[in-house]
Design a protein with these regions (language model features):
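Active-site beta-loop-alpha junctions enriched in small/polar residues
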Residues: 43, 72, 103-107, 135, ...
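Conserved N-terminal subdomain of the carbohydrate kinase-like
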Residues: 1-72, 269-275
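Conserved post-catalytic alpha-helical subdomain immediately downstream of the catalytic base
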Residues: 189, 204-275
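Short beta-strand/loop segments at the ligand-binding rim of alpha/beta enzyme cores
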Residues: 94-99, 103, 108
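A short helix->loop->beta-strand "cap" motif at the edges of active sites that frequently abuts
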Residues: 90-97, 173-177
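Hydrophobic beta-strand scaffold residues
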Residues: 12, 98-100, 131
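Conserved phosphate/ATP/ADP-binding segment of small-molecule kinases
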Residues: 108-203
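Charged helix-capping and loop-helix junction motifs
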Residues: 54, 81-86, 112-121
Length: 275
């Protein structure tokens, strides 16, 4: 696994090892009238076995600009949750920007005292940039999401509804400067119109709808979305529209790639973005 990360030039110096194995999941693809099914097997895995205090965050944050965290980590165990919030507190003190992916997975919150809604809301309160799909935002904020009912790329987003929705979210998360929502309508197992909306400093941004048909593999599409957005922000920080356009193009490409990782590079994403 470490060699795979290094293959893409990622710095693995601060990765620690633990547990008996890597976590796994089993995914049954949707087809026709049958929904997809995901089974997580994380017992005795590295994250599951993480103990509070195992990670020394100070040297990690010394040269960091952004700390990106996931709700999935908080779902693994009480120790993983406490470790996450230790990191958030130190990142804030050291001036490291905090971004988060809500990443709500209901099948993971099993440890005694686990409270997904309260924990995710607290995680979001630390963040200057928050990403999630419609349902995840509803879990984290308890605000009913706006239905996305696109049947093709001609669908029009209700600007006023999203402006009001983002204003309500901003009251709950006053530190957050950018809020990004992934919108997907699963018409059929292999037909998903996809887009995203962004609120940045109180301004609404929209982008094109990709009418993806056929979908090859939807796993990891939201990860590709947020990764592309963070990459774009680091490169074009003064152009929120370009960042959103790049992010949704990155997510759209992932729908055409088998597996849960997107291997698309910047040039390939820009090519799709400019179509």
């Amino acid at each position: 696994a470490l060699l795979h990360l290094r293959e893409f030039g990622l710095d693995t110096r601060h990765i620690i090892k633990g547990g008996d194995r890597l976590g796994t999941y089993y995914f049954e693809s949707a087809a026709s009238m049958r929904n997809s099914v995901v089974v997580y097997d994380r017992n005795n895995s590295s994250f599951y076995s993480l103990k509070h205090g195992d990670i020394d965050w100070k040297p990690i944050f010394d040269d960091a600009k952004i700390f990106h965290c996931s709700g999935i980590t908080c779902a693994m165990s009480k120790d993983a949750l406490d470790t996450t919030f230790d990191a958030l507190e130190l990142a804030e003190k050291m001036g490291v920007e905090i971004t988060c992916d809500i990443n709500y997975r209901k099948n993971l919150w099993h440890y005694p005292g686990a409270d997904a809604k309260t924990t995710l809301h607290k995680l979001m309160e630390y963040s200057s940039f928050i990403f999630g799909d419609q349902n995840e935002w509803e879990v984290g904020s308890s605000l009913t999401h706006i239905p996305f009912e696109a049947m093709d790329s001609s669908y029009k987003i209700d600007d006023d509804a999203y402006i009001a929705y983002f204003k309500a979210l901003q009251k709950q998360f006053p530190r957050c400067k950018r809020m990004l929502i992934a919108l997907r309508n699963q018409i059929a197992s292999s037909h998903h119109p996809l887009t995203g909306v962004l609120s940045s400093e109180g301004k609404l941004y929209k982008t094109k709808i990709y009418d993806i048909n056929p979908v090859i593999d939807p796993m990891g599409c939201d990860d590709a979305f947020v990764a592309a957005f963070i990459h774009a922000r680091m490169k074009w920080s003064d152009d929120d529209q370009r960042c959103l356009d790049f992010a949704i193009a990155g997510s759209a490409i992932k729908n055409t790639i088998i597996g849960d990782q997107s291997l698309a590079n910047e040039d390939e994403i820009i090519e799709v973005m400019n179509q």
